[in-house]
């Protein structure tokens, strides 16, 4: 990580880039209180967190994929967290525990009890990382993955599902900047869902809907190759699209819904010195696939993946990994966190990777990522049957020719 001096100004003739992005992981502490994460080499303004209540690579845990984020805007930290469910018993008649949301936490989750056993809030961004405060910790350590980025302009908010009219483009304004990328997050009946993009280039992931023997099957994944920003939790019966990027916000439209759904949290990003791009790809079964056309060399990829597009069958045709989140950065950090199921009769299980590979499909598929000047290369470490589709959000390194905020590093 290159730390530019404070005196650097954008009129200097030498142009270079420097990374203000990082992904990594940490394990939850044994006791409540503060935990300081260091080693980033810069002061982030935005951090996302993912976990599935377990630590060992490939381990199974009876809890769902959870996610949250924290942002700093005008010295004020705002954070949201969504937790999916844990369950016990067989697929039919499973009991749901702990699903929900928080507007005061960035990390939230539970195992097979009705009591939350992991709660943490981000209390400070500093020159080398961030500080978390735990009010509840699990008996066994949980591995939490994070993505941290310095972004110049950020906006956050909540759109109540019931307040969003059906079929009408609804503006979200008051940001004081024009977003380059918009993200959305909400909780499905099982797990947490994430979407990102710009109008006409939207990508979303969802978990399966709740088990119900009356239906005879479990709708699995709703994802998009470029047309849905946020999809709901009952199969494909709930979706929201971005319809416009405005000078001080964006517009959304609810175009498919059958009954009330969870509110969704949104996050808008813009930066005069950072490039953004979103897209999708199918990881290769063997060899290397090159993705180009981004127009810049990435410094960070945020990945959301699923075993198919719009699949609606018992446990995703039993292909394995139902959905996952992952991240890759230019420091060589690569990780994956998600959930899987092997057969209709099995419980959902969860795993993660902390090695230098992005794993999916019950660890039967593994890939490494390297960045090129116009995109990235995906190389197969382990390939197996079953096609996964990945959507990505790419962040470029900061460009010294753009406007520079105070970095807080010397």
Name every feature range the model reports, one short phrase each.
Residues 1-17:
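Short, intrinsically disordered N-terminal pre-domain segments
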Residues 14-410:
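Surface-exposed molecular-recognition determinants
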């Amino acid at each position: 990580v290159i730390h530019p001096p404070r005196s650097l100004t954008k009129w200097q003739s030498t142009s270079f880039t420097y990374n203000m992005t990082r992904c990594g992981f940490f394990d939850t502490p044994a006791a409540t209180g503060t935990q300081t994460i260091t080693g980033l080499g810069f002061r982030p303004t935005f951090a996302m967190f993912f976990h599935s209540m377990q630590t060992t690579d490939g381990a199974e845990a009876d809890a769902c994929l959870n996610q949250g984020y924290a942002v700093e805007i005008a010295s004020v930290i705002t954070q949201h967290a969504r937790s999916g469910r844990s369950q016990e018993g067989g697929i039919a008649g499973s009991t749901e525990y702990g699903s929900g949301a928080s507007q005061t936490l960035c990390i939230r989750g539970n195992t097979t009890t009705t009591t939350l056993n992991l709660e943490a809030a981000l209390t400070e961004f500093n020159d080398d990382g961030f500080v978390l405060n735990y009010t509840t910790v699990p008996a066994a350590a949980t591995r939490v993955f994070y993505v941290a980025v310095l972004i110049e302009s950020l906006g956050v908010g909540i759109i109540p599902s019931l307040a969003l009219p059906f079929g009408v483009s609804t503006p979200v304004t008051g940001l004081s900047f024009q977003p380059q990328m918009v993200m959305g997050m909400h909780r499905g009946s099982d797990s947490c869902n994430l979407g990102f993009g710009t109008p006409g280039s939207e990508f979303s992931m969802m978990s399966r809907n709740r088990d119900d023997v009356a239906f005879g099957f479990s709708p699995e994944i709703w994802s998009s190759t470029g047309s849905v920003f946020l999809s709901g939790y009952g199969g494909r019966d709930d979706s929201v699209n971005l319809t416009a990027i405005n000078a001080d916000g964006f517009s959304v439209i609810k175009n498919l819904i059958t009954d009330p759904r969870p509110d969704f949290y949104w996050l808008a990003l813009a930066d005069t010195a950072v490039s953004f791009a979103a897209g999708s790809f199918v990881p290769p079964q063997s060899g290397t696939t090159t993705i180009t056309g981004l127009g810049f060399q990435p410094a960070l990829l945020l990945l959301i993946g699923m075993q198919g597009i719009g699949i609606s069958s018992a446990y995703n045709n039993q292909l394995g990994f139902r959905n996952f989140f992952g991240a890759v950065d230019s420091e060589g950090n690569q990780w994956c966190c998600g959930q899987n199921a092997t057969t209709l009769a099995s419980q959902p299980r969860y795993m993660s990777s902390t090695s230098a590979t992005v794993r999916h499909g019950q660890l039967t598929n593994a890939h490494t990522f390297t960045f090129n000047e116009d995109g990235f290369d995906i190389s197969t470490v382990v390939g197996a049957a079953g096609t996964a589709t990945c959507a990505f959000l790419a962040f470029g390194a900061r460009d010294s020719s753009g406007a520079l905020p105070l970095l807080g590093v010397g």
